[in-house]
Amino acid sequence: MPANPELLISPKQRQGGGYEQLAADFLQQQGLRLIARNWQQPKVGEIDLVLIEHGRSWNVLVFAEVRKRKLLGYGDALASITRSKQKKLIKTARYFLRHHPEYADFECRFDVVGFTERTGRSGQGEPLQSEWLQGAFLAPAW
C-alpha cells in the first residue's frame, strides 16, 4: 500500500473533491443531511452526494451532481448535465435504492450544484458563482 494514498488521485479528481466538499457543506447548511459521498455502482456510474431533506410530512432523498465550469462560452456548470448524464445518474440512483431499501419509501429528487468561474477583464479567474438547482431533471416512473 502506498505511503501517501493521495498520490493516486489525479489533480482533476482532487479539485473535483474540493468542489464536492463545498457543495456538501452548502447543502448541509441548508438543512440537508449527507448520507453518502461518491457512491458508485461499478460499470454503471457514480453519484457525487446523496442527502436527506427532512420535511414536515415527508422526507426526500436527494441525489446531487456537482459541476464546475471555468468558461461561460461553453455554458454554465448546470448546462453541462446532458440527457446521457441524466440517464446514467438515474440508473445509478436505482441501484442505490436497491442496495439501501430503507430509503425505498422516500420521494427522490435530482439536484445539481454548479460552480462557474467568471473570467475578468484581466483574464484572471474571479470568485466562483454557485447555483443550486433543485429538481434539475425528472426521472421516469421508478
UniProtKB/Swiss-Prot annotation:
MF GO annotations: nucleic acid binding
Superkingdom, taxonomy of origin: Bacteria
SUPFAM superfamilies from the UniProt entry: Restriction endonuclease-like
Matching InterPro entries: Restrct_endonuc-II-like, tRNA_endonuc-like_dom_sf, UPF0102_YraN-like
Pfam families (alphabetical): UPF0102
PANTHER family in the record: UPF0102 PROTEIN YRAN (PTHR34039:SF1)
Protein family per UniProt: Belongs to the UPF0102 family.
HAMAP family: UPF0102
Protein's UniProt name: UPF0102 protein PsycPRwf_0497
